[in-house]
Amino acid sequence: DGRYIALHLRYEKDMLSFTGCTYGLTEAESDELRIMRENTNHWKVKKINSTEQRVGGLCPLTPKEVGVFLQALGYPASTVIYVAAGEVYGQESHLSELISRFPNVVFKEMLATKKELGAFSRHASQTAALDYIISVESDIFIPSYSGNMARAVEGHRRFLGHRKTIDPDRKGLVQLFDKLESGQLTEGPSFSQLVRKMHKNRQGAPRRRRGPLPGIRGRARFRTEETFYENPYPECICRTTKGGTS
């Protein structure tokens, strides 16, 4: 019927290396990411505790975790998912854990010919722009990590009428995923209820932009404030009255 979810799946090699997130990876893959981080001069932090990163909600969701998350929210296996991302790390092995739950996973390379994509292939920013446009126009947008593009897409969708954007509570989800892994929880109605309750107020409904934390001064004040391009309400969104004026 043309409806689809746009999934901003931040599971590229450089993202995992930069954040130090190695959960679910093999030892060889983890070593490869560590070496990449150590050899990238402009990345200042070299030693990262992957477990602490994940527990703190600072890691992108894995393809498997995204699949579990979407099923818990009640999306059927027939759901079309457009993956807005660069090359997924360990594509076949890791993506299979998402595709096994949602077979209708598509990429821009599957929707356009090589000739059509050729005009953009040498410019990463232009291929990212394609993902951006498709994400803005999707029925539902879900980012697996809160990077700059995800924030910009969310803000754009708010500006266009607060289109549905589901913002995963990564810190909360990790606790639930770990309970699944340890056998304390099982996938099913009870698990779904926990996930849905956790995300009841994280679906792009209108809300005022969050200001800086109280007591914070100087430049740090701006770092604690929700960015304008992530949520332009109320400064840049008109509010209409019953009479039609704004």
Give the positions of each predicted feature:
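N-terminal targeting/anchoring "stem" of glycan-biosynthesis enzymes
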Residues: D1-S246
